[in-house]
UniProtKB/Swiss-Prot annotation:
Keywords: 2Fe-2S, Chloroplast, Electron transport, Iron, Iron-sulfur, Metal-binding, Plastid, Transport
Residue ranges annotated for the 2Fe-2S ferredoxin-type domain, each copy included: 3-93
GO cellular component: chloroplast stroma
Biological process terms in GO annotation: electron transport chain
InterPro entries in the cross-refs: 2Fe-2S_ferredoxin-like_sf (IPR036010), 2Fe-2S_ferredoxin-type (IPR001041), 2Fe2S_fd_BS (IPR006058), Beta-grasp_dom_sf (IPR012675), Fd_pln (IPR010241)
Protein name: Ferredoxin
Subcellular location, record wording: Plastid, Chloroplast
Residues annotated for [2Fe-2S] cluster binding in this entry: C39, C44, C47, C77
Organism: Atropa belladonna
GO molecular function: 2 iron, 2 sulfur cluster binding; electron transfer activity; metal ion binding
Lineage summary: Eukaryota, Viridiplantae, Streptophyta, Embryophyta, Tracheophyta
Function summary: Ferredoxins are iron-sulfur proteins that transfer electrons in a wide variety of metabolic reactions.
Amino acid sequence: ATYKVKLVTPDGPVEFDCPDDVYILDQAEEEGHELPYSCRAGSCSSCAGKVSAGTVDQSDGNFLDDDQMADGFVLTCVAYPQSDVTIETHKEEELTG
């Protein structure tokens, strides 16, 4: 399946289609959108975003704890869309406080 991903970035919103077997960060780059990242392996917080609508599968990541995921935080480098989803990007500072 393919879902609509909306990223709310500091430069304004961008939307693109993302297959459910492609990481959101990878697809965003494929579409020409630059997002922050570092490890690309789900073990840091550089690419952190916050899901404001929809659901993702980020079971490949290990940096976020259950409380952070319950709050909506997501690591875009290891997140597959499971529905149409809206994500606010550039949330590392909010996540790490």
